[in-house]
Amino acid sequence: MALGPWQIFLILVIILVLFGAGKLPDVMSDLGKGIRNLKQELKDNKLASTEDESNL
């Protein structure tokens, strides 16, 4: 089930209410850093697993 435009809008409004307009850039920055770190860890893990398979 995909999110429609109204659901995305509602989620953004709830986030804005919870964190306020002043903190929103900081929250989004931290979220972006977290996603970037997750992608890097997944990439590193994939590289490590392929190296382990090649050593067999």
UniProtKB/Swiss-Prot annotation:
Query: Where does this protein chiefly localize?
Result: membrane
Q: How does it sit in the bilayer?
A: Single-pass membrane protein
Q: Name where it's found.
A: Cell inner membrane
InterPro entries assigned: TatA/B/E (IPR003369), TatA/E (IPR006312)
Q: Which Gene3D superfamilies match?
A: 1.20.5.3310
In terms of Pfam families, this protein maps to: TatA_B_E
* Transmembrane residue ranges: 1-21
Tell me which Gene Ontology terms the entry assigns under biological process.
Answer: protein transport by the Tat complex
Q: What does this protein do?
A: Part of the twin-arginine translocation (Tat) system that transports large folded proteins containing a characteristic twin-arginine motif in their signal peptide across membranes. TatA could form the protein-conducting channel of the Tat system.
- What family does this belong to? Belongs to the TatA/E family.
Name the UniProt record assigns to this protein = Sec-independent protein translocase protein TatA
> Per the UniProt entry, what species is this protein from, by scientific name?
Ehrlichia ruminantium (strain Welgevonden)
| Underlying gene | tatA
